[in-house]
Amino acid sequence: MTDLTSLTLAEARDGLARKSFTALELTDAHLAAMERARVLNAYVLETPERAREMARQADGRIAKSEGGPLNGLPLGVKDLFATEGTRTTACSRILGDFKPPYESTVTSQLWRDGAVMLGKLNNDEFAMGSSNETSCFGPVINPWRRQGSDVRLVPGGSSGGSASAVAAGICLGATATDTGGSIRQPAAFTGTVGLKPTYGRCSRWGTVAFASSLDQAGPIARTVRDAAILLRSMAGHDPKDTTSVDRAVPDYEAAVGRSVKGMKIGLPREYRLDGMPAEIEKLWSQGADWLKAAGAELVEVSLPHTKYALPAYYIVAPAEASSNLARYDGVRYGARADGSNIVEMYENTRAKGFGAEVRRRIMIGTYVLSAGYYDAYYLRAQKVRTLIKKDFEDCYEAGVDAILTPATPSAAFGIGEKTDSDPIEMYLNDIFTVTANMAGLPGIAVPAGRDAQGLPLGLQLIGRPFDEEAVISLGEVIEQAAGRFTPEVWW
């Protein structure tokens, strides 16, 4: 029998339909692979008993020719999504052993469609990070290594566990979230596909909040087709989320293989940065050539406020985080540190419960919202955000269908390489991705090549609002030209 963990999600779905193997066999293969790959630290909680029970139920549905589009397919869940009765911590000490009494909308829709939960995946604490090094469970290790080196690399963040697990073949796909690039950047670092939908396309209800006006759930998968299949189940209107958009969910998989002839692709001149590595520049040109060969038209465009996106993001996001994280006080749930009075208890709980990066962002956020600084920082950042959004609107009104950019300014770096230096060095990893969040647009990262050391590099496509289908079709063109990227097993 084929190694079941090497299948794409679409191949596994088709194999189950043909009864080439059972959902239980597929799940057991992934559970065994998870055991072998524990050194990667991708999972913070494995749920084998629940997974096998869900797989048996899926097999029962298959026997009756019933079941949803994800029936029997084993997935990993980022530890930011509430899973009823199953520990959910956002990878922070402050949530302790918290077991939610409810299920997030996104995961409930996956289970509705028959998916199997393998466990909870590691992420940066409260999704604050670009390398998955801020988790209270320790860093995630990228399954990729530089040629001839055994230096352990980061998988990107904050959805590092999701990306690492998909790349290593220890789940068929994974849920993730993207606030400033947390789906697309780790996908680029691990040779996987990361799809951030339009803001409001997937419900945020039951997902631990970082920055509410920026957070958006989406999938990380091995192929563009797999990401499209997962997004169809994850998306949809939810009356419990006031930012959820009541709009029909299309069949995203139907966009895979659709002709891109005549589509107009913008190449933003502002993304050509000083000091950009030549291999990133070359990859970008190669991606443009692939799209042109498929019949797309290339045009240079201008997004003049791009240079302000990163500083504006690092004002807006911490400001919202400082408000969202005020609820963690040790009173009703999560970890609690004792104090001689209630104020001291609050202070001790938050000081011991939050990690250094989360504390840093809470302090930045509290500062920019404080009297005397609100207008100078937060209000100005929101005005910049409006201008960034208008830049994209102007491009799309001029007939551009999607914008092609690099996904990251470099390949994956070593664990500890950037955490010990200036935190701004780490923040610069989001330079190509934050604009899509600030404007609420859909974006996809697709593996497109390798650097000189054999590490995967990705390209990003940013689409019109609610036109995920365009970036799926275009992303699949790049995928077909570049081929699949799979790391050699060393673990």
From Swiss-Prot:
Catalytic machinery residues: K78, S158, S182
Statement: the UniProt record of this protein carries the keyword ATP-binding: yes
PROSITE patterns to which the protein is assigned, alphabetical: AMIDASES
A Gene Ontology molecular function term of the record: ATP binding
GO cellular component, one term: glutamyl-tRNA(Gln) amidotransferase complex
Alphabetically ordered keywords of this record: ATP-binding, Ligase, Nucleotide-binding, Protein biosynthesis
Top-level taxon in the UniProt lineage: Bacteria
Keyword DNA-binding: no
Coiled coil: none
GO process annotations (BP): translation
Function: Allows the formation of correctly charged Gln-tRNA(Gln) through the transamidation of misacylated Glu-tRNA(Gln) in organisms which lack glutaminyl-tRNA synthetase. The reaction takes place in the presence of glutamine and ATP through an activated gamma-phospho-Glu-tRNA(Gln).
Family classification: Belongs to the amidase family. GatA subfamily.
Database matches in NCBIfam families: gatA
Assembly: Heterotrimer of A, B and C subunits.
Name this protein carries in UniProt: Glutamyl-tRNA(Gln) amidotransferase subunit A
Encoding gene, per UniProt annotation: gatA
